[in-house]
């Protein structure tokens, strides 16, 4: 089951959080859902070169809050914050409400080579430049290992290297426990448009195990602490002392 279901959807509420946080009635829910889709599509098209790995959306009354996780925050912010104002006006135009309050928070991704989306984006860019897919995967594995990930799995499918028959190939380094719910697994998919057709890319990144109570990720090489087993009490047999 863990190999077929979406890794993030399986772990919602355990190690993963929802990308959209808001509540709506049955009448307004479809409208807000379409707004979220339009906002993410607009940001992906306009700021494709900024390396945005995720867009988190939260709503409070009439206020819209966005959190953008990016590898290059300077591309979005611009000079003296001019890019933020341009992005805000673009979002208001996209949703068709110029009076909507939009708060934007740009967060820089600390470990770029440990992010599944950015790794998939890197692989897609290399494949579109006609770099051999085996060499591209090997370079992505090396970058992820230098970033300190515990495990990585990469899958590429399509007409690899221009072959007439499409096929799927994958490689894995380290551990990628898809059945372990407490495992923090980052998952992303991308498409590479080549002259021979579209190549599909899937990336799984295992970053560690999250303890539910402590909400801490277990560091590299460490094992989760187990409760010490209680030793059984020993009783002496004194039934024959008074006989």
Curated annotation (Swiss-Prot):
Disulfide bonds: none annotated. Residues 233-243 have a biased composition (Basic and acidic residues). Residues 216-243 are annotated as: Disordered. Keywords: Ribonucleoprotein, Ribosomal protein, RNA-binding, rRNA-binding. SMART domains: KH. It comes from the Bacteria. It holds the Pfam family Ribosomal_S3_C. One of its GO terms (molecular function) is mRNA binding. Gene3D superfamilies: 3.30.300.20, Ribosomal protein S3, C-terminal domain. One of its GO terms (biological process) is translation. Residues 39-110 form the KH type-2 domain. One of its GO terms (cellular component) is cytosolic small ribosomal subunit. The keyword rRNA-binding applies. InterPro entries: KH_dom, KH_dom-like_a/b, KH_dom_type_2, KH_sf_prok-type, Ribosomal_S3_C_sf, Ribosomal_uS3_bac-typ, Ribosomal_uS3_C, Ribosomal_uS3_CS. Part of the 30S ribosomal subunit. Forms a tight complex with proteins S10 and S14. Belongs to the universal ribosomal protein uS3 family. Binds the lower part of the 30S subunit head. Binds mRNA in the 70S ribosome, positioning it for translation. This is Small ribosomal subunit protein uS3.
């Amino acid at each position: 089951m863990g190999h077929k279901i979406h890794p993030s959807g399986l772990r919602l509420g355990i190690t993963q959080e929802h990308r959209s946080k808001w509540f709506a009635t049955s009448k307004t829910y479809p409208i807000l859902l379409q707004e979220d889709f339009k906002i993410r599509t607009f940001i992906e098209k306009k700021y494709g070169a900024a390396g945005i790995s995720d867009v988190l959306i939260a709503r409070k009354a009439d206020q819209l809050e966005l959190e953008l996780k990016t590898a290059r925050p300077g591309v979005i912010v611009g000079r003296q914050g001019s890019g933020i104002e341009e992005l805000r006006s673009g979002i208001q135009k996209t949703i068709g409400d110029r009076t909507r309050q939009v708060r934007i928070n740009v967060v820089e991704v600390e470990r770029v080579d440990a992010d599944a989306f950015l790794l998939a984006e890197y692989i897609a860019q290399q494949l579109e430049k006609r770099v051999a897919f085996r060499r591209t995967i090997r370079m992505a594995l090396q970058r992820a290992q230098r970033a300190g990930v515990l495990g990585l799995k990469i899958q590429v499918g399509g007409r690899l290297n221009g072959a007439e028959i499409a096929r799927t190939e994958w490689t894995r380094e380290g551990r990628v426990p898809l059945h372990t719910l407490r495992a923090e697994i980052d998952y992303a998919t991308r498409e590479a448009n080549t002259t021979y057709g579209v190549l599909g890319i899937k990336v799984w990144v295992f970053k560690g195990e999250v303890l539910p109570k402590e909400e801490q990720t277990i560091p590299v090489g460490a094992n989760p602490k187990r409760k010490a087993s209680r030793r059984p009490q020993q009783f002496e047999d004194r039934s024959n002392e008074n006989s």
